[in-house]
């Protein structure tokens, strides 16, 4: 039997595909290589996976019924990471985000129902908490006050997963990711964007006064959490859980800029701009539930994580012939 990873060519998806293949799993990767960012980056993300005979690559869109006809039937677990991501773009295009993240997820759930696939891990987001008054964020918070269309679509996805699980016997864990970073991070995300500007000698555009906080989670810790949740599902039939995966510590925006600049060996110039709509002031994960259910313990410090990211980032620039 195989694991189906949707969004397999993306940041988290490509790392997960490699991890599973390295551990001997049969993996099916579904991706539409959309133009949200450069598709050639996503192509490179799967270069190593394509070296494995146990990897089946399927090009298709989760909104397209024909994409599901291309998939093999021998699938027992789905890790659903395909989505339109990002808070600010969702404000500009709420209908597009609904179409991919809500309708696309519903079509995937229908596919699982038709084939009798028993287990699902759904990639959700810390953004569902909005500006939660309860810190750190706990899974039993209502999560009913999202402040962006993206957050609303992720909460809608969690609820649809619950409904399908109840009606059709799909066991599921919804994983609320907290600001994931590391090699292959999407180029539109802050750490990657700031690194690019720092390397080019440009000022960092900081929205707000720099005191907003994020719980940054290194990609390896996220992969450990996903795999822990997969094992938990295998031994826990009848499950529906919502679980935080975070670093369990916060870093201010201003401190993040300093850490990234230090890792790159440069001094930052900061241009202060007004705060942007849809951005939450703080994220902070209570990960005690993940630890209790499947032993999740984030281990990569922000200092070490930014060092690893900078090493990868500079290597990528060197390979592309970009220096300084």
Enumerate the language-model features and the residues they cover:
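N-terminal Rossmann-like NAD(P)+-binding domain of SDR-like oxidoreductases, especially those catalyzing
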Residues: 1-180, 223, 300, 316
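Hydrophobic alpha-helix immediately C-terminal to the catalytic Tyr-X-X-X-Lys motif of short-chain
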Residues: 156, 160, 164, 194, ...
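C-terminal substrate-binding subdomain of Rossmann-fold SDR/epimerase-dehydratase oxidoreductases
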Residues: 16, 22, 60, 198-324
